[in-house]
Amino acid sequence: MSIDLHCHTRYSDGSTPLEEVIALAALRGVGTLAITDHDTTAGCETALRLGREYGVRIIPGVEISAADPARGGKAHILCYAPAHPERLLPLIDETTRSRRAAMQASVEKVMRLYPISREMILRRAEGSTNIYKQHVLQALMDAGYAGEMFGEVFRRL
């Protein structure tokens, strides 16, 4: 039986709904699965319930986005089974607001460069707590402007 300690769902930038992720884990023999969506614990309670139903041990978690001022780059911190997840909410909320503002600017830029609508992007972000680059790229792929998820267009976004 295997373990996966870093899994994203549609609550953040994953493309698969939570229940389907857990069902696939069970089908593939994953005995323990950590749900670590970006900057949200929104699916954790549901994941614990679904894990019991599918026979998969769920580790609730979150991948917290952070900055590394010393290197001038981004860092992601995985937090597993937080004892007091509510204490993470102020940090998560601040990050979510910041991401939302940045993605609004990105969406505006993409809509100037390509004839796609905000609705196309929002449709791809349905079920997520925010819009991510993957959602924008999925909309561009749907419209035929990108051929692959992490190719040239993704790098330019």
Could you say what each language-model-derived stretch is?
Residues M1-K74:
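An N-terminally biased module of ancient metal coordination in phosphate/nucleic-acid-related enzymes
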Residues R52-L157:
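Extended substrate/RNA-proximal surfaces in nucleic-acid metabolism proteins
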